[in-house]
Every structure is written in C-alpha cells, then in structure tokens.
Amino acid sequence: MFRSFASPLALVATSALATNPATTAQHQGSFWIQTFGCQMNKADSERMAGILEAMGYHEAPAELEADLVLYNTCTIRDNAEQKVYSYLGRQARRKRTHPHLKLVVAGCVAQQEGEALLRRIPELDLVMGPQHANRLEALLTQVDNGQQVVATDDNHILEDLTTARRDSTICAWVNVIYGCNERCTYCVVPSVRGKEQSRSPEAIRLEIEGLAARGFREITLLGQNIDAYGRDLPGITPEGRRQNTLTDLLHHIHDVEGIERIRFATSHPRYFTERLIEACFDLPKVCEHFHIPFQSGDNDVLKAMARGYTVERYRRIVNRIRELMPDAAISTDVIVAFPGETDAQFQNTLNLVEEVGFDQVNTAAYSPRPNTPAATWSNQLPEVVKVERLKQLNALVERVALQRNSRYSGKVEQVLAEGINPKKPQQLMGRTRTNRLTFFAAEGPQSCRYSPGDLVDVQINSVRAFSLSGTPCDQTRSRH
C-alpha cells in the first residue's frame, strides 16, 4: 500500500511517486539512522544514508540531536520489535517539543504494521517498507509537503541510484537478490520483504568495480536466500540449466581488479549445489567461510518448519565442503523450542552442532511472529523450556567454537585489517579468510606500521571462543 495523508486524507498513486523525478532541494539538517537486524538491513541503511547525504543532510553526532531520525527495523524476533517501539516512544515524546523533527520508520516492522504504526504513533512522518529504500528522497518530498506517508506496496526495487554511505572503507555489502520465495512456517521475511528480485549480473559487477576503484578490498554478496539468485532472471544454457545462478555470478565478478576477497550470505541448504561448492574451491578470491543455517537437527522438526531438506542432506553439504576445503569455516543459525519440539528432538540439534563442529552459531529460541503458520499452533512450548534449551545450546556452541579456534594456535593467518580495536587503540582488528575476528599490534617488525585495508600475516598466540590474537609477521600487502 502507498498512502500519503494530509488534511483532508488523500491517496497518492504509487506509479506517480515512482516515476516523478526526485526533488533536488538541498537540506541543511542532520540525520541519525539506527539499524536493527540483519546484514540486509545494514546494507539498506547505508544506501539510505547515501541518499540523505546527497540531499544535503549530514550525520548528527547523537540521536537526540538529529533533525531526522530513521529507524530501520527488524521483525524476525519479538524482542527486536519491542526495542523499536521503545526507541520510537522516546522520539515521539521529543517531537512534541521539537515539531520540526522528522521521524521515519523503515524496514520490516514498517512493512508488517503499515498504517497501524501511524495509529499507534501519530507523530510519525514516514512509514516505509524495505522495498522502498531507494525511494527515500521522493518519499521525503511528500513529507516536506506536510503529509504523513505510508509506503508498503509490493514494488519492483529500483536499481541503486545514489552512492551508498558505507560504514567501512574496507569491506562492503553488495545486495544481489531481494526478498524470499520460501514459506518456512516460522518466518515473517517473505511477507515483509516480498518476492525474490535478482539484480542483473552487469549491475552487480558495475557496483563492485566502483567499490574497487574507491579502495574497497572485500565484498559480501547479500541475499535473504542468496543461493536462489537468478531464478527470476531469463536465460537457459545449452545444457538446460539456468543461465544466471550464484555460481555464474561468482565467476562473473571474480576478476574485478582490486577486490581481494569475496564472501556471500545467507545460504539455504535446499539450494546449495555441488557446482557452487566446486566454484568456491576453484576461485581463489572466494573465502573459505560458509553461512548455512540448519535451524534444527531433527528431520521431523525440519518438516514442520517447511525447510525442504533433511539432516542427511545438510551433512552431505558440509562433508563435501570440508573434503575440498578442510579448513573451511561453517557458521549457522539454530532455533530451539520450536512448537512441539521434544527433548529427544532438541538433543538431535545438540548432536549435530557437536558433530559438524560449527565455527559460529547464531542461536535463538522460537519466537511466534505475526502472519506465520507456526504462531497459530497449539503446541507452543513454555518460556522456561525456551530459556533452558537456549542456555544449553549456547554453552555447547561456545565449547565447540573454542575447540575449533584452538587449532589456530601457533599458525600464521592472513588478516584483512578493518580498523582499530576500540578497547585497545594500539591494536588493529580484522578477519581471516575464514571470518575469524583477529586482534594484532598496529606496529610490526622493524617498526613497520599497519593500516586498515592492509593484508597482514599474523602469528596466532592466543585463542578465545570467538576471537584470535596474534603478532604480525614480516609479510604484508598494503592497501595502496
């Protein structure tokens, strides 16, 4: 839905907004963006920050000093959604004494709630779903004209028109596919992010070439279900397969000069193919790190979740990855206490975590979400069970992660320096190819100083469950 509310109420056609040129008026105010949730939201926030800066806004030093406050929201868990309402309440009270404040809610909560948000928080100026991130300037033009705007209609996502204001100068998110066509029974994403929309390989490569020209060294290709990339694009090869797949995209962008590392997330076991695994092995820039959610280690629970694969298939994927890339890191997402999950089924999840030996696990207790089948089921588990199972899982995850990291003690790992350690300014921090957070001294042998963007060989001398520390060696590859 797209509505623009004034006095009297007026309905503004979506097509008019999409085709009218955006305003060129320059704003002198400041903005603040608070991002909740996934990497897709972070990438959307970077694009919206770029749009605001192109409009003449500048970033405020603090949220309570901003003339425009934008919350890019997440609805994947109830606690994230409630946090948003807490922030909004504070800003709504502020607006009563600062009437020129613009208050914007973007992202998945905006898409889910739509006009209901205006009824709950009438101080809002703009409610916009994630498909409208690139339309921010045109939407704010309506706000400048004194209207309250709700933009939650299912739209084709415009190609990026404004340079994103990146939070990093080293590593960049690159959206390659938006939306999700899966129908997992617990997940609200398809209803708030819409159907899959793949960007063209040419547009993606052009963006990456621009990033390389600006000095970026690492890119992460993003999608809610990135292995589905290209399903909506035309073209069939002589062999009868789709012409545009994630595997083809990796080959298409691999030779962009200046980009040293390529990652991608998030994968779905249902679409993670042998051909993709072999491409990751063959292409030297693709990092040996794979984020593949398994959600549950029990086949009956997976069936209830409508995930479309079995534990056996997941094992085959992991085994093949490690057959070709023995040191590859595998991270995952897990949900415990799904409706009806028994003690034995939960134990199957624990068993799989230990068997696979995950390097990192994003854990969560099941949270009923609006407009999802699982939220309506009668076999919901009590909160005390959720808390206890999550506690058990987290303890196991930390133990397994420490075991995995212990293998690196004494080894030399190549680290891409991303910035200064905020707790120890004399240190830099970065990540290995396997995505391990690593800290090391900014000054190396023979008074050599390292900078963000350098690729530094670091000898690991201390390991923790979720980070490594070490000493720089002589070898380094400068960013410049």
Swiss-Prot record:
Identify the residues that the record assigns to the TRAM domain, covering every copy. Answer: 406-474
Q: Which residues form the Radical SAM core domain?
A: 166-403
Binding positions for [4Fe-4S] cluster 1 per the UniProt entry: 38, 74, 108
Keywords (alphabetical) are: 4Fe-4S, Cytoplasm, Iron, Iron-sulfur, Metal-binding, S-adenosyl-L-methionine, Transferase, tRNA processing
Subcellular localization is given as: Cytoplasm
Which positions make up the signal peptide? none
A single GO BP term for this record reads: tRNA methylthiolation
**Which Pfam families did the record assign?**
Radical_SAM (PF04055), TRAM (PF01938), UPF0004 (PF00919)
The residues listed in the UniProt record as binding [4Fe-4S] cluster 2, with positions renumbered to this chain, are: 180, 184, 187
**What is one cellular component GO term in this UniProt entry?**
cytoplasm
Checking Gene3D superfamilies in the record gives: Methylthiotransferase, N-terminal domain, tm_1862 like domain
Per the entry, which co-factors are needed? [4Fe-4S] cluster
E.C. numbers: 2.8.4.3
Note how many cofactor molecules are bound and how.
Binds 2 [4Fe-4S] clusters. One cluster is coordinated with 3 cysteines and an exchangeable S-adenosyl-L-methionine.
Q: Does the keyword Iron-sulfur apply?
A: yes
Q: Where is the MTTase N-terminal domain?
A: 29-145
* Keyword Cytoplasm tagged: yes
For this chain, one GO molecular function annotation is: methylthiotransferase activity
Reactions performed catalytically: N(6)-dimethylallyladenosine(37) in tRNA + (sulfur carrier)-SH + AH2 + 2 S-adenosyl-L-methionine = 2-methylsulfanyl-N(6)-dimethylallyladenosine(37) in tRNA + (sulfur carrier)-H + 5'-deoxyadenosine + L-methionine + A + S-adenosyl-L-homocysteine + 2 H(+)
- Broad EC category: transferase
Question: What is the purpose of this protein?
Answer: Catalyzes the methylthiolation of N6-(dimethylallyl)adenosine (i(6)A), leading to the formation of 2-methylthio-N6-(dimethylallyl)adenosine (ms(2)i(6)A) at position 37 in tRNAs that read codons beginning with uridine.
- What does the subunit comment say? Monomer.
Q: PANTHER family recorded for this chain?
A: CDK5 REGULATORY SUBUNIT-ASSOCIATED PROTEIN 1, MITOCHONDRIAL TRNA METHYLTHIOTRANSFERASE CDK5RAP1
Q: Which family does it belong to?
A: Belongs to the methylthiotransferase family. MiaB subfamily.
The name on file for this protein is: tRNA-2-methylthio-N(6)-dimethylallyladenosine synthase
Species source reads Prochlorococcus marinus (strain MIT 9303)
